[in-house]
């Protein structure tokens, strides 16, 4: 354990780096406001005294627009129906929620949308009757691939008046793919003849059409869903109201923070302008990177926080919300603690069935590669996603290799003999700073594309060598100390 004064120094330095770099982004946003407004049409509203808003983050704008139109009211309807069903018809609550989910899906996606979800679900259920994991996965991948066929896309576009409706269908089918895959694989693992009626088609529909997670997740495995949905214990009305009030308070704070960032820092518009990105100062470049990943974090606190709140009111335990990215210091931690539901899905249904760590080094490398290949394809399979997946695979592989090396008895004895616990902690943070730099780079590729990643690589690691590179690693060294201390506290709690 490091001295308190040293940890406090690292924390203050980290906060100082954050705020100063954000200030640099704010200045650049103001200086180039007219230029960015002409190119990207910044929005004007009265939320923050008339400040213009960067609305170029498609995902945030998309879900906020749908939320105002339909989703907030449909989610409120789910909450009311669920509470009424719990009070009046508890035994039939899963089927009532299933019917409500179908109706809500019909409200926003129409008959063709509901039919597509039903079609994919039915095909997956029929294939699962063969009790073959291989056939189930081939079926799921085939259904997923149909979402990217140009001819199929054109047909689906003709069903709707706006692009937003088409994209909502695409997002819904993409997330539903993980849900019907989870059910089908769980069915494959049941011994014949299946004694439980939990793996019937009605339960599959109740799982797939559970509305809070229908369009965007988070991911909850069927085994967890069925176990929790069948339990009879539920919170009292008073406890539910407390959960609702606290949850809404947190959601409003997260939403306000995300909107404030979009009004003060035009990071998404600047990322879309590569010539401008190549000319800003290194401080601004660092602030843009921090602002981008932190906005992504706050955005998913909202997007996952809303369904998580409704799941708690329904008596379900949702996956944990993302942990703050400023406390992440490894690829492994990022995957484990950001999208917990997706991580659990990948481990349970991809990594372990392929072989996991039970087949030696090559088996581990292959299982990890297959996991990242699937998650890249599931996200869309674009070039920048394969690059992002490769960087993550390499990062996780190197981290696990270093961890195994350090855990060997010979290295352990040498470290214990020649280095104090404080020195070992500092050495850990130094290694973590290198990993964190690559983690941020991979996240920027995911959020901004290959061109943004290349710009950062050239400016920080090629043109900026040695002083800019070493300065960045020094800043990340402070971040890593904070992250390591946070991780230890998190593990203790």
Swiss-Prot record:
Principal location: endoplasmic reticulum
Transmembrane intervals: 6-22, 68-84, 132-148, 163-183, 244-271, 282-310, 364-380, 384-399, 428-448, 463-481
pH-linked activity: Optimum pH is 6.5.
Activity regulation text: Inhibited by NaCl concentrations above 150 mM.
Catalysed reaction, written as an equation: N-terminal L-cysteinyl-[protein] + hexadecanoyl-CoA = N-terminal N-hexadecanoyl-L-cysteinyl-[protein] + CoA + H(+); N-terminal L-cysteinyl-[protein]-C-terminal glycyl cholesterol ester + hexadecanoyl-CoA = N-terminal N-hexadecanoyl-L-cysteinyl-[protein]-C-terminal glycyl cholesterol ester + CoA + H(+)
Lipid moiety-binding residues (S-palmitoyl cysteine): 188, 242, 324, 410
Disease involvement: Nivelon-Nivelon-Mabille syndrome: An autosomal recessive syndrome characterized by progressive microcephaly, cerebellar vermis hypoplasia, and skeletal dysplasia. Additional variable features include early infantile-onset seizures, intrauterine and postnatal growth retardation, generalized chondrodysplasia, and micromelia. 46,XY gonadal dysgenesis may be present.
Protein name per UniProt: Protein-cysteine N-palmitoyltransferase HHAT
Gene: HHAT
């Amino acid at each position: 354990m490091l001295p308190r004064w040293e940890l406090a120094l690292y924390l203050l330095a980290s906060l100082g780096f954050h705020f100063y770099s954000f200030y640099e982004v704010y200045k650049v946003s103001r200086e180039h406001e007219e230029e960015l407004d002409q190119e990207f049409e910044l929005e004007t509203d009265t939320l923050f005294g008339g400040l213009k808003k960067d609305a170029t983050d498609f995902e945030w704008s998309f879900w906020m627009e749908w939320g105002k139109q339909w989703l907030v009211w449909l989610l409120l309807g789910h909450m009311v129906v669920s509470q009424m069903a719990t009070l009046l018809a508890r035994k039939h609550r899963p089927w009532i929620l299933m019917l409500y989910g179908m109706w809500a899906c019909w409200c926003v996606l129409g008959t063709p949308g509901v039919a597509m979800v039903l079609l994919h679900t039915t095909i997956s259920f029929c294939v699962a009757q063969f009790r073959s994991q291989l056939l189930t996965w081939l079926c799921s991948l085939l259904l997923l691939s149909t979402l990217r066929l140009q001819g199929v896309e054109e047909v689906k576009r003709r069903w709707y008046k706006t692009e937003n409706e088409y994209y909502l269908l695409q997002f819904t089918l993409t997330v539903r793919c993980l849900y019907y895959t989870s059910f089908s694989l769980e069915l494959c693992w049941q011994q014949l003849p299946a004694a439980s009626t939990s793996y019937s088609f009605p339960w599959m529909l109740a799982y797939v059409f559970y509305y809070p997670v229908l369009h965007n997740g988070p991911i909850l495995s069927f085994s967890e869903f069925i176990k929790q949905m069948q339990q009879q214990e539920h919170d009292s009305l008073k406890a539910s109201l407390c959960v609702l009030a606290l949850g809404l308070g947190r959601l409003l704070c997260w939403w306000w923070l995300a909107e404030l960032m979009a009004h003060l820092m035009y990071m998404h518009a600047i990322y879309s302008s590569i010539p401008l990105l190549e000319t800003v100062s290194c401080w601004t470049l660092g602030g843009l990177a921090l602002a981008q990943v932190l906005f992504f974090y706050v955005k998913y606190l909202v997007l996952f926080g809303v369904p998580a709140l409704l799941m708690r009111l329904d008596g379900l335990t949702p996956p944990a919300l993302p942990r703050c990215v400023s406390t992440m210091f490894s690829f492994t931690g990022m995957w484990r603690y950001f999208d917990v539901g997706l991580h659990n899905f990948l481990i349970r249904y991809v990594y372990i069935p392929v072989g996991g760590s039970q087949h030696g080094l090559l088996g581990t490398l292959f299982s990890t590669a297959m996991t990242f290949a699937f998650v890249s394809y599931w996200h869309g399979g674009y070039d920048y996603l394969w690059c992002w997946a490769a960087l993550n695979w390499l990062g996780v592989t190197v981290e696990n290799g270093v961890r195994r090396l350090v855990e060997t008895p010979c290295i352990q004895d040498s470290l214990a003999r020649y280095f104090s616990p404080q020195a070992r902690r500092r050495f850990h943070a130094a290694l973590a700073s290198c990993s964190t730099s690559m983690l941020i780079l991979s996240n920027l590729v995911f959020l901004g594309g290959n061109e943004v990643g290349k710009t950062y690589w050239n400016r920080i690691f090629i043109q900026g060598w040695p002083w800019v590179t070493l300065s960045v690693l020094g800043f990340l060294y402070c971040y890593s100390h904070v992250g390591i201390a946070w991780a230890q506290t998190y593990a203790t709690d």
